């Protein structure tokens, strides 16, 4: 079937099971071929082909509402709703988004990117439906990994209490990105092996109704048998106790079983949870056999061999530099522990996990818990290293404020994927952390200019015992600089001059330092002398350095790959104002006040005007012509 000719999912209504099976093969082949060129979340989507087709066949989107939790598994949904022809632009600038996007299609009713939000949003839609007295189905699709998130559990509790009509699809592939962890994961494991609970329960109820009423004792005994059945079949029956009708487990690749169960769910009042067992990566052997999450999301790859197409790496990944330095220090200090919320592979903590399994803690998709747990460990003299992506640290903000900073606890937060991350787009750009951390009392915030300084700042963080400290580091690789053998502590709140200059100064840090250096060198050739400062401590700033610089009364430009509002540049402006430098000319470059879409980092930087050319032009406008050297 030519998938690019699909306009909407209505064509599925008249297709037979054998035709649907052929369509499944076509979609898997299409995904494997297309994603080999663009990269993307291949394994999650290969696992939900039949489930997605079944949902679109039995329900009527967009009247019926599908909410894809996390959203990385929505590619099949996009194909069935008329977007196959755009897959060549997947996750590229102004191309097809890798997650549901409301402006992209009327079938995308809820935007996602972070996990565990679908149930709360679905509850909101269902309550709105009931208030408006309409009849559409609301169907959140959530994975077993996302179900461990606290927000999802809060929603389950509320939905079950209110008995709201809703069909929750639990897509259980036993993984989130890496293998799942936790007690709920173990509950699901027991459910997988327990058989079809709801069918057996219905049969028993039918039999019990046939028992003649020969006395209260028999009736009471029969009722107890019925009430106790779930405990005989499944230990806990977690979802039934929460107020859901539990259906399953059902084979998520068997159309007959899917249709039977979903039709049953459509007729059932109140909240229903359909437990669907799927195989992540199904239909492509390299992805299907992956047990650690390598094929969860990938770049381009060779279909035949399963080898990834990667540019030759000339420098280590930032995540590896940080995690390996932490590991090196952990060998000499038993108090150091590593904590991750379900990202051991992305944060490059596999080596730490292998060497110190008892000191490496993966809490699952539970950022709030991870953060406060780290705080608790710090109260007992441990040295917790919390490795967390910038975008996911947003989810634990209150815990950082209330539990870590307020108590001034020695927690080292490794803020991975800081700055623009590219193809994953606006839900994943790490551009807000400076603004939401800089104003917190007791917080120290750093970002290195290169991987060598990065390892020294990790050492600095582990030696620091006066409160919380955080290190920002980018996605991707470092610069390939020489790495010192001996680690050293860098004095807190100190900056360094990278290039001397007399007519203007650029204050920056991290990934924008090469941009600033190149701009300064070009300006030098044009007769403009510009100082470049490595402001590696975003907080506390180097106040002595700032006093000296502001006293020279030369233009100052701050550059940051982070949002301008409340950012580093704002801090410099505040310092100048509060210290009486009222004639100081301080201008800022950074991320404007909007969400930044998906695309390559280079393209996105061009789009927002954060380039070497833009820096050169800005400095020229800041310096009067009469001050420029001939």
From Swiss-Prot:
Protein name: 1-deoxy-D-xylulose-5-phosphate synthase
Chain's role: Catalyzes the acyloin condensation reaction between C atoms 2 and 3 of pyruvate and glyceraldehyde 3-phosphate to yield 1-deoxy-D-xylulose-5-phosphate (DXP).
The record's free-text note on cofactor binding: Binds 1 Mg(2+) ion per subunit. Binds 1 thiamine pyrophosphate per subunit.
PROSITE patterns listed in its UniProt record: TRANSKETOLASE_1 (PS00801), TRANSKETOLASE_2 (PS00802)
Chain sites annotated for binding thiamine diphosphate: 72, 113-115, 145-146, 173, 284, 367
Cellular component aspect of the GO annotation: cytosol
Keyword Magnesium: yes
Similarity field: Belongs to the transketolase family. DXPS subfamily.
Species the sequence originates in: Bacillus cereus (strain ATCC 14579 / DSM 31 / CCUG 7414 / JCM 2152 / NBRC 15305 / NCIMB 9373 / NCTC 2599 / NRRL B-3711)
Gene Ontology biological-process annotations: 1-deoxy-D-xylulose 5-phosphate biosynthetic process; isopentenyl diphosphate biosynthetic process, methylerythritol 4-phosphate pathway; terpenoid biosynthetic process; thiamine biosynthetic process
Molecular functions (GO terms): 1-deoxy-D-xylulose-5-phosphate synthase activity; magnesium ion binding; thiamine pyrophosphate binding
Pathway named in the protein's UniProt entry: Metabolic intermediate biosynthesis; 1-deoxy-D-xylulose 5-phosphate biosynthesis; 1-deoxy-D-xylulose 5-phosphate from D-glyceraldehyde 3-phosphate and pyruvate: step 1/1
Pfam families the UniProt entry points to: DXP_synthase_N (PF13292), Transket_pyr (PF02779), Transketolase_C (PF02780)
């Amino acid at each position: 079937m030519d998938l690019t000719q699909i306009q909407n999912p209505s064509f599925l209504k008249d297709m037979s099971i054998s035709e649907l099976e052929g369509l499944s093969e076509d979609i898997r082949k299409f995904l494997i071929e297309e994603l080999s060129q663009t990269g993307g979340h291949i394994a999650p989507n290969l696992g939900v082909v039949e489930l997605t087709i079944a949902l679109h066949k039995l329900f009527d989107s967009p009247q019926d509402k599908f909410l894809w939790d996390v959203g990385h598994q929505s590619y099949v949904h996009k194909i069935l709703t008329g977007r196959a022809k755009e897959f060549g632009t997947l996750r590229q600038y102004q191309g097809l988004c890798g997650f549901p996007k409301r402006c992209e299609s009327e079938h995308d009713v809820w935007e996602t990117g972070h996990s565990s939000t679908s149930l709360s949003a679905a509850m909101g839609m269902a309550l709105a439906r009931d208030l408006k007295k309409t009849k559409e189905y609301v169907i959140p699709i959530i994975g077993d990994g996302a179900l461990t998130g606290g927000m999802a559990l809060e929603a389950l509790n509320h939905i079950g209490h209110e008995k709201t009509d809703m069909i929750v699809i639990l897509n259980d592939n036993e993984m989130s990105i890496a293998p799942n962890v936790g007690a709920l994961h173990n509950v699901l494991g027991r459910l997988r092996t327990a058989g079809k609970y709801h069918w057996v329960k219905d049969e028993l109820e039918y039999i019990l109704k046939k028992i003649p009423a020969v006395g209260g004792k028999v009736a009471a005994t029969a009722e107890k048998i019925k009430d106790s059945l779930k405990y005989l079949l499944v230990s806990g029956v977690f979802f039934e106790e929460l107020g859901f009708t539990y259906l399953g487990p059902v084979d998520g690749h068997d159309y007959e079983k899917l249709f039977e169960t979903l039709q049953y769910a459509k007729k059932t009042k109140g909240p229903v949870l359909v437990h669907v067992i799927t195989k992540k990566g199904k239909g492509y052997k390299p992805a299907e056999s992956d047990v650690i999450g390598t094929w969860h999301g990938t770049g381009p790859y060779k279909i035949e061999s399963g080898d990834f197409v990667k540019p030759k790496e000339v420098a280590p990944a930032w995540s590896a530099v940080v995690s390996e330095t932490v590991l090196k220090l952990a060998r000499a200090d038993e108090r150091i522990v590593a904590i991750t919320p379900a990202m051991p592979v992305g944060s490059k903590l596999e080596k730490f996990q292998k060497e110190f399994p008892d000191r490496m803690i993966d809490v699952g998709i539970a950022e709030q818990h991870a953060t406060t747990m780290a705080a608790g460990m710090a109260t007992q003299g441990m040295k917790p290293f919390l490795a967390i992506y910038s975008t996911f640290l947003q989810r634990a903000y209150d815990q950082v404020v209330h539990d870590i900073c307020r108590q001034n606890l020695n927690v080292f937060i490794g803020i991975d994927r800081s700055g623009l991350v590219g193809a994953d787009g606006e839900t994943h750009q790490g551009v807000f952390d400076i603004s939401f951390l800089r104003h917190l009392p007791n917080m120290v915030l750093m970002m290195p200019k290169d991987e060598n300084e990065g390892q020294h700042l990790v050492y600095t963080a582990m030696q620091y015992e006066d409160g919380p400290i955080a290190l920002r580091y980018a996605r991707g690789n470092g610069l390939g600089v020489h790495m010192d053998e001996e680690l050293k502590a860098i004095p807190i709140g100190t900056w360094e001059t990278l290039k001397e200059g007399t007519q203007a100064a650029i204050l920056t840090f991290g990934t924008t330092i090469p941009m600033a250096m190149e701009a300064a060198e070009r300006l030098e050739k044009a007769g403009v002398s510009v100082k470049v400062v490595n402001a590696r401590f975003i907080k506390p700033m180097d106040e002595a350095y700032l006093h000296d610089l502001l006293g020279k009364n030369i233009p100052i430009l701050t550059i940051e790959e982070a949002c301008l509002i409340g950012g580093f540049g704002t801090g410099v402006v505040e310092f100048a104002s509060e210290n009486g430098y009222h004639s100081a000319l301080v201008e800022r470059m950074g991320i404007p006040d909007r969400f930044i879409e998906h695309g390559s980092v280079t393209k996105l930087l061009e789009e927002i005007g954060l380039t070497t050319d833009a820096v050169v032009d800005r400095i020229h406008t800041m310096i009067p012509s009469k001050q420029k050297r001939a």
